[in-house]
């Protein structure tokens, strides 16, 4: 079972937002309580945080799927749902986050560095938040927005001060074991080390420094031979490169100078930046017969190249102390010369005044609408609710989508795609269309509403044509149907029952009927009185 993993594929899923609640307040003696549906909670984020106690990506190797909790739905009585908890994933220092296409998202260096890998979805608004002067009691609520889904590649680049590089079996693991308290696996066969071994070394009064034992490199490592690419990335962050050369090798065609040239060529081929790193040379295994003589022979050539050379023996610890002091001094000098890490600046870029909220482009035989607002509105719309669909249509119309579609020549019935939803577009006609007849919220022509009964104007005209000698006792009929036609011009999905503009409560209907009966009785009394006066007057004239 692996104990060190430096590359994994992580499938992150943020929490979905909670749905809003569509609820009406119910309380004794309050028949028109109004909407009281609460908002849904926000979905949890998936966050990566650098933890110094974590040194490997092993946990994600066994658990590659990570999901944050979703937001709770809203409830009645204006109770909002709880937000989902963020999922905190600890990662080692030096973790690089990449997309599936290899694009780098973030380089996490330093304890506490954090990155939001996937953001949770917004919670849907309840009908209490959707109420307005025109829509006083919405019978719908917004759905929670889905959380983000992301497949990311996590790569660990070891953060160390010193990198020990060289051919397999050059003695790198043995050297790191005597420089520090690390206990790597040591054997007499190539590629014993398959993962970097880290150790913390101390020398004199200098601060401690970190040493990384990089697995062995061979010719073609920069092209991936011998897992070269997996090993070379652990050198990128090291500030000092130490070439460990085997002076006791018996392989034909190999000697310390040749090995140095091969490793230098692979480093330069992998990254040009590595060619500029400070470096020194360690001639290892001088305890082996004839190895010390070979070390003395090549030392002059190495120093002629401007390299510091140290001859050591990991077995007898000869020269190890001097090497450790030199490494500590070099690391301290490099740390002092390194520029301080600047704090990340948060740049706020204001949105342009004339920047459109959406774009409409031709897409096959239809049109494609892109934009954060319309796509979010579609995701949060409950398409099983007619009022919610009408609300979406109103929002798109106010945003100017209909005007843009009409400008581009869209006709009724053409397919329009917004996000993952495709529908047939039916233009909403304003007043004056269809010969002056506007459309109500449900698509019915306003002039057809109440056409079976005369309105107030028709009743007044009819009353004027009656005989002036016969008074009209009944008052003008309330234009209830006309009011209904006017109210239907409001946005689709408005609740006329609670608005009080169209439908009357039982008490109001009874009061109106009572007033009508009283008016009829008064009119009958006036008619009887006028008839009696006429009869009396006629008798007087006859007597006269």
UniProtKB/Swiss-Prot annotation:
The gene is obg. Residues 2-159 form the Obg domain. This is GTPase Obg. Keywords: Cytoplasm, GTP-binding, Hydrolase, Magnesium, Metal-binding, Nucleotide-binding. Residues 456-472 have a biased composition (Low complexity). Mg(2+) binds at residues 173, 193. PROSITE patterns: G_OBG, GTP1_OBG, OBG, OCT. Belongs to the TRAFAC class OBG-HflX-like GTPase superfamily. OBG GTPase family. GO terms for molecular function: GTP binding; GTPase activity; magnesium ion binding.
């Amino acid at each position: 079972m692996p104990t060190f993993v430096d590359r994994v594929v992580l499938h992150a899923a943020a929490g979905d937002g909670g749905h809003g609640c569509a609820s009406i307040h119910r309380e004794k003696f309050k028949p028109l309580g109004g909407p009281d549906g609460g908002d849904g909670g926000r979905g949890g984020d998936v966050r990566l945080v650098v933890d110094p106690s974590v040194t490997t990506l092993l946990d994600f190797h066994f658990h590659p799927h990570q999901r944050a909790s979703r937001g709770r739905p809203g409830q009645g009585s204006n109770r909002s749902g709880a937000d989902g908890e963020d999922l905190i994933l600890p990662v080692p220092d030096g973790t690089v986050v990449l997309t599936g296409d290899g694009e780098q998202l973030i380089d996490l260096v330093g304890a506490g560095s954090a990155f939001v890998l996937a953001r949770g979805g917004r919670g849907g608004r309840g009908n209490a938040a959707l109420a307005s002067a025109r829509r006083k009691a919405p019978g719908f609520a917004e759905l929670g927005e889905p959380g983000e889904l992301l497949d990311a590649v996590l790569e660990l680049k070891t953060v160390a001060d010193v990198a020990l590089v060289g051919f397999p079996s050059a003695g790198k693991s043995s050297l790191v074991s005597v420089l520090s308290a690390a206990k790597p696996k040591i054997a007499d066969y190539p590629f014993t080390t398959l993962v970097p071994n880290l150790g913390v070394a101390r020398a004199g009064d200098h601060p401690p420094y970190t040493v990384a034992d990089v697995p062995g490199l061979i010719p073609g490592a920069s092209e991936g031979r011998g897992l070269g690419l997996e090993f070379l990335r652990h050198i990128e962050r090291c500030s000092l490169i130490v070439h460990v050369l085997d002076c006791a090798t018996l392989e034909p065609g190999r000697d310390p100078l040749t090995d140095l040239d091969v490793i230098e060529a692979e480093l330069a081929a992998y990254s040009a930046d590595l060619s500029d790193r400070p470096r020194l040379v360690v001639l290892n295994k001088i305890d082996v017969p004839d190895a010390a003589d070979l070390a003395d022979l090549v030392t002059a050539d190495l120093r002629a190249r401007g390299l510091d050379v140290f001859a050591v023996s990991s077995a007898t610890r000869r020269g190890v102390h001097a090497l450790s002091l030199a490494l500590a001094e070099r690391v301290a000098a490099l740390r002092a010369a390194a520029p301080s890490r600047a704090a990340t600046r948060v740049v706020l870029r204001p949105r342009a005044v004339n920047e459109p909220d959406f774009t409409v482009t031709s897409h096959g035989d239809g049109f494609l609408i892109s934009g954060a607002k319309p796509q979010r509105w579609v995701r949060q719309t409950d398409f099983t609710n007619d009022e919610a669909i009408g609300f979406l249509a109103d929002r798109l119309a106010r945003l100017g989508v209909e005007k843009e579609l009409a400008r581009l020549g869209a006709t009724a019935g053409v397919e329009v795609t917004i996000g993952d939803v495709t529908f047939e577009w039916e233009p909403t006609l304003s007043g004056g269309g269809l010969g002056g007849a506007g459309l109500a919220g449900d698509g019915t022509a306003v002039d057809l509403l109440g056409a079976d009964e005369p309105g107030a104007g028709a009743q007044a005209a009819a009353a004027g044509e009656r005989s002036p000698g016969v008074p009209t006792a009944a008052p003008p009929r309330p234009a209830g149907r006309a009011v209904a036609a006017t109210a239907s011009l409001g946005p689709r999905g408005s609740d006329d029952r609670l608005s009080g503009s169209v439908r009357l409560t039982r008490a109001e209907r009874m009061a109106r009927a009572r007033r009508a009966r009283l008016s009829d009785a008064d009119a009958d009394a006036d008619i009887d009185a006028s008839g009696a006066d006429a009869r009396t007057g006629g008798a007087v004239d006859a007597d006269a």
